[in-house]
Amino acid sequence: METATLVAISISGSLVSFTGYALYTAFGQPSQQLRDPFEEHGD
C-alpha cells in the first residue's frame, strides 16, 4: 500500500476509536460518576 493510504487509515481509525471512547464515557458505565451541576444547584 501507499504511505498516504496507511496514514489515512490510521488517522481514521484513531478518530473512530476516540469517538467511541467519548460516547462510552458520556453515556456508558463511567457516566454514573459524573456530577450534574444543575442538580446540585437548587432553586
Curated annotation (Swiss-Prot):
Domain of life: Eukaryota
Family matches, as Pfam families: PsbN
InterPro entries: PSII_PsbN
Keywords of this entry: Chloroplast, Membrane, Plastid, Thylakoid, Transmembrane, Transmembrane helix
Compartments reported by the entry: Plastid, Chloroplast thylakoid membrane
Entry annotated with the keyword Cell membrane: no
GO cellular component: a single term: chloroplast thylakoid membrane
Residues annotated as transmembrane: 5-27
Membrane topology per record: Single-pass membrane protein
Keyword Transmembrane helix: yes
Biological process according to GO: photosynthesis
HAMAP family named in the record: PSII_PsbN
Stated role: May play a role in photosystem I and II biogenesis.
Family that this chain belongs to: Belongs to the PsbN family.
Protein name, UniProt field: Protein PsbN
Lineage summary: Eukaryota, Viridiplantae, Streptophyta, Embryophyta, Tracheophyta
Gene, per the UniProt record: psbN
